[in-house]
Amino acid sequence: MKEIPITSFDNLQIGQAENAAAGTGCTVVLLGKDGAPAGLDVRGGGPASRESELLKPLAAAQVIHAIVLAGGSAFGLDAAGGVMRYLEERGIGFDVGVTKVPLVCQSDLFDLTVADAHTRPDAAMAYHACVNAESGNYRDGSYGAGTGATVGKLLGMDHCMKSGIGSYAVQVGPLQVGAVVAVNALGDIYDYETGRKAAGLLADDGRTFLDSELLALQSIEVKENKFVGNTTIGVVFTNARFDKSRLCKIAGMAQDGYARAIRPVHTTADGDSIYAVSLGDVAADQDVVGALGARVMAKAILRAVQAAEPAYGFPAVSSL
């Protein structure tokens, strides 16, 4: 098994755009002119999403044409309109005779409390991200959907750290599996291979880690003021051939990567979601791909916080 660039996959382009001053942005995943089968698994209690019904096994559509990861919470769902315009202009979408309708799914994270709550990803920003995908401008760190991402918010924004978007991909023989994830978790972030905490809840000194899980366990009383501005959203890619029902299972297995790297995870204050996409025709075991999906997702989460830069008054791993 060897690490490969996330750009190694055929039929995949990733572009990003952001408004750094406003603390928000979007990441667009384009899935080729013919689209690709995709599945979705949602574990968080507060998702903001678009066209997720398309990915259910009983839905008629067998492929989608793009996935958008964005900030802006539900306001940011406007961004998909820009992706649809970009794809329609290029004749990409589901043929309905008079035009082609691009099938674009989207999940958003909450970054409204970071800088400017009234500036969010919109159609223009997402269209720009599509144009950027042509030149492959994807970068890990505080870009795209990760622009306003933060982690460790059990005690609110005053004790959190800056996060971002991260990627990781591997190849085993002809099989490729990779992940891109925007990490905006309530919980803390860990290197699952060493058990070391990498980022998360900070004490009043702004440098010492506190343990979010231990703090949460100090009282079983219902917390009415739990900070709700969270959500980790990601995509697993593989060049193996699967239909969307199997991809839903692979996405579910990839959620184990969230559980390895984020503690606590899948809370009612998160909207944790993972897409899984098939980009090729390699014959591979579904469970092997799912297990690799969990591995690359956990590694991508770690990379998201390691690549982030301090911003908006929030420290990052690089500044501790």
Which residues does each predicted region cover?
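A structural signal for small-residue-enriched, beta-sheet-centric alpha/beta enzyme cores
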Residues: 1-74, 78-81, 89-320
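Acidic/His-rich segments in extracytoplasmic proteins that coordinate ligands and/or metal ions
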Residues: 84
